[in-house]
Amino acid sequence: MIQEYQLRVLPEVAANEQRLKEYLIHEKGLNAREITATRILKRSIDARQRTIYVNLNVRAYLNEMPKEDEYQHTLYNNVEGKPQVIVVGAGPGGLFAALRLIELGLRPVIVERGKDVRERKKDLAQISRQQLVNPESNYSFGEGGAGAYSDGKLYTRSKKRGNVDKILNVFCQHGASTSILVDAHPHIGTDKLPRVIENMRNTIIQCGGEVHFETRMDALLIEKDEVKGIETNTGKTFLGPVILATGHSARDVYRWLAANNVEIEAKGIAVGVRLEHPATLIDQIQYHNRNGRGKYLPAAEYSFVNQVDGRGVYSFCMCPGGFVVPAASGPEQIVVNGMSPSNRGSRWSNSGMVVELRPEDIEQFTIDNLQFTISMQHDSAANCQLPTVNSQLSMMYFQEYLERLCWQQGNMKQTAPAQRMVDFTKKKLSYDLPETSYAPGLVSSPLHFWMPSFIAERLSKGFQLFGKYSRGLLTNEATMIGVETRTSAPVRRRSRRSCTLCSPERRSCVWTPTRSARRMGTKSSCGSLKKKRSRSCSAPRWSPRAWILRTSRWSASS
C-alpha cells in the first residue's frame, strides 16, 4: 500500500529519514513494522515566523518496496540519415531543442561559437587573472551558455510554458541530483552542471547528431524567400532549417537581424547592480536567529519586489552562499553576474538588484550618448547604421552604454566599481569596501553619481523600502557591484498571428521543436513530417526546406 501525507515538521526531522519515520508513526498512527520505505516528493521551507518549519509531501510505502524510478526516462532513438536541422547555440535552449528534435525523428546539427564546457574554464580564469576577455569564450559563450558557470538555478514562476517536470527529469537522466525534483527552488550548482551538460552533448552525438565548437554563425543563407542554412566563420556552410538559440548576449546576431530587415523590436529589460552581503547576515535576517541557519537549514534566500515611481525594483537571480563573477562577453565591458556551488558554502550571498526599464525610459538619452557603439560593431554588422533611441536595437545599445561606462569607472580593467549600500542611499563615496567574492577586485566609485538617475534613484528608494520590510538588509556591510545588465534579451519578435508562428506581414515562419507538433505536423511511422493546415486560420504551406524559417523578412526568436 502507498499513502501520501502533507507534513509540516522541524528542519531536524526533515533532514533525517529515521526521525521522519518516527514522526509518521507517532503523528499519523502508522505501524513501524509496515513502513518499508519513505520518499519525499516535494520540499519547501517556511521561514515566515520565528520557528522555522519544512513543508513536505511524503509518500510512505507500507509492506511493499518502491517500484518506480525516482525520475522518468526519455527515450532518444538514433536519427542518423534523417533530415537535419541546424541549431545555432549550445546553451540550454539549443541543447533542449536538439534533444526535442531527436524525439521528433530529426537530426540536430549544433553550431556553437564558443568552446566545450571543460575548455571554457581556462578562458574564464583568464578574465580574473589577466583581465582578458575572449569574445568567443566567456561566461556567456560556450557549451552550456550563460548558465553553465553562473549557478544553474531551475526556478520559474511560469505555469504556461510547457512541461517543467520533463525538463527536470531530463537533467536527472543526464546526471543531476534527484533533489531538483523535490525542492521548491531547484538548484544544480555551478560545480555539478558542466558534467550534466557534457552528458547531454554525448546523448545528442550518440543518437546521430553533430556538435561543432568554435564555429560562429555569421549569416543566414536565404534564397528565393527560403532560409537554406547558415554561413560560419570557418568558411563552412550548414544546410537545412535553422533554429536560433543564440542567447541574450549574441549582439552580432541582433545586428545582423536588424541590418537584414528582420521583424524584431526593442523590449523592456531590467538593469542594476549585484548586491553582496555576508552570508551569515542573510541567514540571521531570513531565519530570525542570531546564530544563523544552524545545522539543518540551507543558506538562506530572499526575494524582494516593489513599485518605485511607476517601475518595478526587485531582486533577481539570488545566489545564497555564492560568488559574484565577471560576465563580460567582449572588450571594454564590465558586466557582473552571480553563481553558487551545489553546497552554497561561500561566505557571501548575492543577488541582482534591478530596475524595470522600458524603451520609452531612455528617450532622454540622445544619440551622442550612444556614439561609442559604432566602434563596437563587428564582422557582418560593420555596415549596420547606428540606430536612434527609438529603434529596434535601442535597448541593446543602452546596455552597451552602461557596460562601457562601468568599465571606465573600473579603471578600464575588470576591477568593478562598487559602493557600500547605505553610502549609495546617502549619495556618499565609500572610502573603503568590505571583503568580496569578486575575484578581479573592486574599486570604490560613486555609483549614485554616474549611473543614470532614473535607475539610481529608483534603486535607492527600493533599498530603503526593502530595509523596512527586512530589518538589517540595508547596511554598510553590503556592497553594490556594477553593473548587472544581462537579465534578458533586449529584443523580441514583433507581434504575429496567434494561431501560427508566422509573421503578420510576410507569412514568415519560425518553428521551434519545443512547440506542439500538432500545429505544424505529425510524425509518421517512417519519421517524416506531415504538414497540416491550422483549422483556426489559413496558414501557408511550407516546402520541405522551410519547416523552421521561410521568407526574406522572417521573425526572430527573442
Task: Tell me what each language-model feature is.
Residues 2-52, 58-149, 153-368, 374-382, ...:
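Residues forming the flavin
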Residues 485-558:
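Inter-lobe coupling/hinge segments of SF2-like helicase ATPases
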